[in-house]
Amino acid sequence: MEPAFGEVNQLGGVFVNGRPLPNAIRLRIVELAQLGIRPCDISRQLRVSHGCVSKILARYNETGSILPGAIGGSKPRVTTPTVVKHIRTYKQRDPGIFAWEIRDRLLADGVCDKYNVPSVSSISRILRNKIGNLAQQGHYDSYKQHQPTPQPALPYNHIYSYPSPITAAAAKVPTPPGVPAIPGSVAMPRTWPSSHSVTDILGIRSITDQVSDSSPYHSPKVEEWSSLGRNNFPAAAPHAVNGLEKGALEQEAKYGQAPNGLPAVGSFVSASSMAPYPTPAQVSPYMTYSAAPSGYVAGHGWQHAGGTSLSPHNCDIPASLAFKGMQAAREGSHSVTASVL
């Protein structure tokens, strides 16, 4: 009976790729060959490929067997449970050991001999498939044993408590072991007023109240900041429309609050109440001669009440400091005048 699946060769016979030829056909090939029929005639008669017939006859002449498979039989299994156990022991003792080192140890310890020792690739496959998962599990278990127990988180009611019967119940909640006790100054009760400002929502009011009570220095409360409104500032005059006066009022409103440790508002002066700067005196571009021996000095446009043109600062010039050029000029002017006359 022909198989229900397979392929058809060039001779019209059916075969299954990858499957050995049935033993009955193998025996028939050997019988026909013993009768003296040529392999090509056996191939045509049994509709088996010529290569298959030649291979079966060659194996029969060498081994005397018509069975398929390896001639010498398969290699005996070397990865026995004992070998795998020793490999696991070596890997646990030295996690960084190589496959060739494990092979040498198997030979040195007498677990295997040179005929049945596994190859380096076989040892690598054992480490990857059979021992890899177990080693990871062992490392995870040891890590869990050495890992300290996680401490419980802080209770919610110790930080955020509310003015209700929950507050009393939260105050009685014992502190879990391993967590430091929270002092009363930190575990503050939070009160929620009727207003919905950012200061009240963030709880800055209660924090600043406790800090101001515990601090020896005076610090302004948040209530003073929140109560500060536009009605505390004087209204601008109707004629104050220009940007200068508006900017001055905005500066006063901006810097009206004094932070902790800074002087009060009274020490600041608004820009509008300051007098304008005096106009600088005009300097004459001309140079006036000074009697000082240092040379030429730029004189001012004004003159002292008791000074002269040569001495604007009202200082006396001694006679010994007179210059010869000035005397000669004076004498020359007198001579010219006399000649003209």
From Swiss-Prot:
Stretches the record annotates as Interaction with KDM5B: 168-189
One BP term from GO: regulation of transcription by RNA polymerase II
Record-linked PROSITE patterns: PAIRED_1, PAIRED_2
Region described as RED subdomain: 82-130
A Pfam family assignment: PAX
Record's keyword terms, sorted: Developmental protein, DNA-binding, Nucleus, Paired box, Transcription, Transcription regulation
Span list, region PAI subdomain: 7-63
CDD domains, per the entry: PAX
UniProt DNA-binding residue ranges: 4-130
Single GO cellular component term: nucleus
SUPFAM superfamilies: Homeodomain-like
UniProt cross-references to SMART domains, sorted A to Z: PAX
GO MF annotations, alphabetized: DNA-binding transcription factor activity, RNA polymerase II-specific; RNA polymerase II cis-regulatory region sequence-specific DNA binding
Location of this chain's protein in the cell: Nucleus
Subunit and partners: Interacts with KDM5B.
Record's function text: Transcription factor required for normal development of thymus, parathyroid glands, ultimobranchial bodies, teeth, skeletal elements of skull and larynx as well as distal limbs.
Name the record gives this protein: Paired box protein Pax-9
Species name: Pan troglodytes
Gene, per the UniProt record: PAX9
